[in-house]
Amino acid sequence: QFAMKVPGIEAIYTWEDVPQERFTMAGQTYPELSPYDRQILDQHVRYVGDPVAIVAGENEKCVDQALKMLRVEYEVLPANLDPRKAMDKDTPLVHPEDNWKALCNIGADNKKNLCATEETHEGDVDAVLADCDVVVEHTYHTKANQQAMMETFRTYCFIDEYGRLNVVSSTQIVFHVRRILSNALCIPKSKIRVSKPRIGGGFGAKQSSISEVYPAFVTWMTKKPSKIIFSREESQIASSPRHEMQVTVRVGANKNGKIRAIDVYTLSNTGAYG
């Protein structure tokens, strides 16, 4: 209530003010392979930087002042930080909610901390490896990688003369963003128009919806124009990096060097959301 009294503040929203439907921010063709595991704002935050409120005001100065006046009380829950232990019996669930859903049958199971799982094989690899003269096995680790495009995430929204929500965004996926916003805001796609000007780089980072949902919600609620511009740090925190991987490879060969079998097991640290 103190933050709302800051001159120029238009609105402050928390998880109680937004639709409770879950959606995915992944820029994928419908039905998406990524699970519907996000909300615009969620009571259960899952990483440092997960949004807890939307503050809208006339200028950046008043918004920054209001942000400093917000007080958030956190109940600290047991963390799940090691992907190698993520499926253990007593490991905390990242998504315990009942309205989590996966549209495609790709082995996703939120009650097991699984975003996806798949197995494919040709022949009996274990039997062939057991019959090989030489078997080499090694486990490799790759770190998470994050893009650093010149232009950070940013979105501008307004309501046009037809009552449509217009979204102008630095994105690579205008039609996917339209569907994502429709799911997040619970409004028809026909009420949304997404435009993409020339963008200052993406490299795949802008193939997910990152910044669009927050000003879109503000504009849809207030019917006033809004925009958001992420800082470099915010862009690094909020977007989806290439996942950390643990890859175990077994290669079997004859003494003459002919490779007879290859077995690969990959564990991907997907993180807080799919």
What are the roles of these predicted feature ranges?
Residues A11-E16, Y47, V136-Y140, V167-S169, ...:
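General beta-strand structural signal in soluble alpha/beta enzymes
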Residues V94-L185:
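Helix-loop-helix junctions that connect adjacent transmembrane helices in secondary transporters/permeases
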Residues D17-E21, T142, V174-F175, I199-G200, ...:
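Short acidic loop-to-helix transition motifs that present clustered carboxylates
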Residues Q20, P35, C62-D88, C115-E119, ...:
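Gly/Pro-rich active-site capping loops and adjacent beta-alpha segments
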Residues Q1-W15, A53-Y74, T155-T222, S268:
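Alpha-helical support elements that line or immediately flank enzyme active sites
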